[in-house]
Amino acid sequence: MSVWDSISFNNRFTALPRLFYTPIQPTPLNNVQWLAWNHNLANELGFPSFECTSEELLETLSGNVEPEQFSPVAMKYAGHQFGSYNPDLGDGRGLLLAQVVAKSGETFDLHLKGAGKTPYSRMGDGRAVIRSTVREYLCSEAMAGLNIPTTRALAMMTSDTPVYREKQEWGALLVRAAESHIRFGHFEHLFYTNQLAEHKLLADKVIEWHFPECLDDDKPYAAMFNQIVDRTAEMVALWQANGFAHGVMNTDNMSIIGQTFDYGPFAFLDEYDPRLICNHSDYQGRYAFNQQPRIGLWNLSALAHSLSPLVDKADLEAALEQYEPQMNGYFSQLMRRKLGLLSKHEGDSRLFESMFELMSQNKVDYPRFFRTLSNLDTLLPQDVIDLVIDREAAKLWVDNYLQRCELEESSVAERCEKMRQVNPKYILRNYLAQLAIDKAERGDSSDIDALMVVLADPYAEHPDYEHLAALPPEWGKAMEISCSS
């Protein structure tokens, strides 16, 4: 019996008209081998347990053999890239292989990245390399561990097929799993090409599949947009609170269901720098860390324009006006949790602002600062102060923080226990990802395996992996990453 016979399929996207996609077969790579298999996610999706030895799964997920349940397609969409509309986008190196029903009953896309040329590849070769594949695999699972909405990564495979970027590299494959691959750019494409019947059909399907609570609303499309605004606001707030810089927030990289999507030149903050630009192609800093909330609104405005045939202008504007207060509300709530403050008090905003000023002016390590605060049940206030160059300013802030904590009903021990559940000890620092890539390119997945342990539960101590909580070496600070993959 085939392994696929034990899995339920729901290939609903390919039931849409052909103008939404192009059927196409993956182009096989040479001598494909497993690099990683995500056992936890595989179990959630209903795959049988195995130790990366299934030849059938390797052959089918790599695209070498097509099971009868698969119907691989390249999706068509458009999008605004660095603020300019580009109509010529689509899945240029990835294919939606199939949609499976997880144990939870939710439908998940299985998407193969690096599958070869498609009609939307433009000048590209349709391939991915080990470098970018490892980064997405690790980061999507790191985000899941931080409880940030995200696509997931099921598997990685390597090959002997040469791929040429700045130098020769080796072709690799990533199997991504997500509840949806529908992007803001799907609606933009249909709107700008005046395919309004199909545009409405897509909106109907998005509501049916992802926002069924909107079906009974008097204005279902407006209700859908409200949901998208809210989910995007929460996602961006989670990015900011956790120090995540996406790097390339084009509208074709924005998920319609508010999941972090398309990991490329991302970074997690080491030293706190609100102006961090992690994408070396972002010459103007459009997607700098501190610009992400503004760009979230810009992208939603672009989506709103493309939804204008379905939603009244007043309803679109009303939803957009809610984005900033929603995002700020989510962010304030997250910062209170990170600081162990369960109640709201006047002056909290100033406490946050002065904290960020202190960290920015003194290049304080962002995750280390919050994790140290979380351990004040066993550490001294001086341990927090010692993280900061300007000790006098640090002491002033710590004194103000401890005075604010006195307004809480919880004990220090209770407060710190809760803080350790939201302030990770382990994050995917870029230098750790690079070390894992270097080993993976030599056929060694041990660093990937170790990182997957701590990233799955980044709040635990993991004493055997203490070295993965180390601050970056000089070469690993403020790394700028290329979009090339």
From Swiss-Prot:
Database matches in InterPro entries: SelO
Pfam family, one: SelO
Keyword match Protein transport: no
EC number, UniProt record: 2.7.7.-, 2.7.7.108
Binding sites annotated in the UniProt record for ATP: 90, 92-93, 113, 125-126, 176, 183, 262
Binding-site residues, Mg(2+): 253, 262
Reactions mediated catalytically: L-seryl-[protein] + ATP = 3-O-(5'-adenylyl)-L-seryl-[protein] + diphosphate; L-threonyl-[protein] + ATP = 3-O-(5'-adenylyl)-L-threonyl-[protein] + diphosphate; L-tyrosyl-[protein] + ATP = O-(5'-adenylyl)-L-tyrosyl-[protein] + diphosphate; L-histidyl-[protein] + UTP = N(tele)-(5'-uridylyl)-L-histidyl-[protein] + diphosphate
UniProtKB keywords: ATP-binding, Magnesium, Manganese, Metal-binding, Nucleotide-binding, Nucleotidyltransferase, Transferase
Residues at the active site: 252
Class in the EC hierarchy, top level: transferase
Cofactor: Mg(2+); Mn(2+)
GO MF annotations, alphabetized: AMPylase activity; ATP binding; magnesium ion binding
Function: Nucleotidyltransferase involved in the post-translational modification of proteins. It can catalyze the addition of adenosine monophosphate (AMP) or uridine monophosphate (UMP) to a protein, resulting in modifications known as AMPylation and UMPylation.
The family this protein is said to belong to: Belongs to the SELO family.
Protein name in the entry: Protein nucleotidyltransferase YdiU
Lineage of source species: Bacteria, Pseudomonadati, Pseudomonadota, Gammaproteobacteria, Vibrionales
Gene: ydiU
